[in-house]
């Protein structure tokens, strides 16, 4: 696809600012992931997803549905049980179907960039409510209270890059 606007490569320098990284993901949480997928299919044109699901570190369950549209990956998330608060706490309670923006996702390219992002977060006084190192990625959420959503940072491993490259493209 040819883009109408020239897009410069990301200036990856998280020490200078937490948004100065490769933005690649927009994520939403939902109370009903099947209904959210159907909404994305019928109203927004995203027809195919890659599913990733499993147990949360604290014992609950998480399910995500992922799809590329151009250079942005959309992620739908639903979680339940212990540890799901990070994902579900900002949704309205007891009102049936709901979906809300949860985070922007950023790729980092080196351990140096990862360490700079962690240090910058600490200097800002922001919290990192979740951090994990798994076979796909090293990942963390930064709570950016002024933005009203999280910033998620990935330091991908080859298996994670392979997985992301296999997500359906639209």
Q: Residue locations for each model-derived region?
A:
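N-terminal beta-strand motif that seeds the catalytic metal site of vicinal oxygen chelate
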Residues: 2-37, 99-106, 165-170
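A cross-kingdom feature marking solvent-exposed beta-strand/loop segments within repeated
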Residues: 12-13, 48-61, 83-94, 134-137, ...
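Vicinal oxygen chelate
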Residues: 1-16, 23-31, 65-70, 74-75, 91-113, 118-170
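Hydrophobic, ordered structural segments
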Residues: 82-84, 94, 105, 109-113, ...
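N-terminal strand-loop-strand beta-hairpin
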Residues: 3-5, 12-13, 22-28, 43-69
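Amphipathic alpha-helical segments
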Residues: 32-48, 116-124
């Amino acid at each position: 696809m040819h883009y109408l606007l020239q897009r410069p490569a990301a200036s990856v320098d998280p020490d200078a600012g937490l948004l100065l990284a490769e933005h690649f993901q927009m994520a939403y949480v939902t109370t009903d992931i099947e209904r959210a997928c159907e909404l994305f299919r019928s109203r927004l044109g995203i027809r195919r997803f890659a599913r990733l699901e499993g147990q949360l570190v604290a014992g609950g369950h998480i399910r995500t549905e992922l799809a590329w549209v151009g250079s942005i990956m959309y992620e739908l998330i639903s979680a339940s049980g212990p540890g799901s608060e990070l994902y579900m706490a900002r949704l309205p309670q007891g009102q049936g179907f709901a979906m809300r923006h949860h985070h922007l996702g950023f790729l980092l390219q080196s351990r140096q960039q990862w360490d700079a992002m962690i240090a910058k977060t600490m200097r800002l006084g922001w919290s990192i409510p979740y951090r994990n190192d798994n076979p796909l990625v090293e990942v963390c959420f930064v709570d950016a209270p002024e933005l009203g959503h999280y910033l998620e940072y990935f330091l991908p491993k080859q298996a994670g890059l392979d997985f992301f490259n296999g997500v359906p493209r639209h």
